[in-house]
Amino acid sequence: MFRVIACGFPAAAVPSLPYGAVVELPHPSEPGFLDAALDHLLSEESDVPRLLVHDGTRVSEHRLRLLRSVYGDFRVLPVGVRRPLTGLASTATVLAGLAELGVAPGAVLSGLPLILGHSRIEAVSRRVSGLDLPEIGLRHHLVSMIPGAVVRIRFTERIEVGVPRSGHHADALIGPDAVVVRAGNPALAGRLASRGQPVSNGQLPTIDVEGPAPVTSGWWGTRNYYERCVLTSDLRVLASRIGTGPWRRCPECGEPVTSHCRFCSAQEAFV
């Protein structure tokens, strides 16, 4: 069992998942983050590991490692997720669902790539100058200067920039338990559709992530964007794959995780 803390964003309110169990703290770059985080941790003394999900930027990594040092407990574990707002919100909710299913925190940390692959994120933006990605090239900047043009981005196992419109095969992968988590300008939603064909998942439950994206995340830098994350709300298959997968290694040092980790001696956190 573990608890999930979202640093700088809300959890996606998927009705069938325990999103209400996710605690929301300020973004790590905000001046009051350390005080708010320490107040929460000290007011809820527990032996249960806490996973602090953040946007994976250098600032967030530094502040969360500082928090872990000040608090002095190895059970406070930062989890960097290099995804935009819908991906962060969805990941926090999925982690809370896996905790409810009894998945061990060590297995969750070592199986994080599989968890990120559980959701599919697509986005369009009219501007790429705010994107902190090595994949952004000169041609993407030139395209974003054309009136009415958008740059498409897809988040799978890797980040793809300038991808074509979604094909029918992608929509065919959406199952009956899927939900859509979205953010940004809904007027751009049609730009994610297949050529000449609207996206076929209009009947799926749709959840809006309220509030702005973290300003230091290095994503859109503009209001003229739209992002959509599609995930399956039934996590039982995912939990089974994580529990039996070959990727059980400590994210801190790469040691194989069995009952403990020699790097951080986190026996309670990794069983």
Tell where the protein language model's regions lie, with residue ranges:
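Cys/His-clustered metal-coordination modules, chiefly Zn-binding fingers
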Residues: 179-271
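Domain-scale terminal segments
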Residues: 1-196
